[in-house]
């Protein structure tokens, strides 16, 4: 991972401020999870903007279809009651699957009619796949992956979500 040089810092800060409330809500969600043993505080600190949202904040993509976040939780227990408490949904295929390297959760309720929230929980490398842009909003910096992404086989629902993200990033 390398720090990404931002050519238009004012635009970066404006776009980062646009998603700040959503990011703060996600941080509180992970703090709740840490307090209740669903993750550690170190796990919660790995939360970052990712995928189409990070590309947009960095000025490298169109307006996102989702507010996309990633977090690494090494000891993630699936299914996650804490995420269900905060109205995060997962596909039936994911719910019924064996252990996966990544779990995708969607929340359509918090910002209904404005933006859906996508949270990808990684058991291993947080930066393994997807678009190469990541924004650490706690430090206000952007990172870019410099190596090729890994390819994980996805359940059908997750594949549709990822295709929607890819289409929005391409526009």
From Swiss-Prot:
This is Uncharacterized 19.0 kDa protein. InterPro entries: Nucleo_LEF-12. It holds the Pfam family Nucleo_LEF-12.
């Amino acid at each position: 991972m390398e720090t990404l040089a931002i050519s238009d810092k004012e635009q970066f800060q404006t776009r980062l401020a646009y998603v700040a409330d959503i990011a703060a809500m996600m941080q509180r969600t992970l703090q709740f999870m840490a307090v209740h043993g669903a993750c550690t505080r170190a796990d919660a600190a790995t939360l970052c903007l990712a995928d189409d949202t990070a590309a947009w904040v960095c000025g490298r993509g169109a307006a996102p279809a989702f507010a996309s976040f990633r977090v690494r939780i090494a000891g993630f227990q699936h299914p996650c009651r804490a995420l269900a408490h905060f109205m995060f949904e997962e596909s039936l295929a994911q719910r019924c699957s064996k252990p996966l390297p990544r779990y995708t959760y969607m929340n359509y309720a918090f910002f209904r009619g404005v933006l859906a929230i996508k949270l990808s929980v990684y058991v291993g490398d947080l930066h393994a796949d997807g678009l190469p842009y990541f924004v650490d909003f706690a430090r206000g910096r952007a990172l870019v992956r410099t190596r090729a992404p890994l390819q994980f086989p996805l359940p059908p629902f997750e594949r549709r979500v990822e295709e929607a993200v890819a289409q929005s990033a391409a526009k």
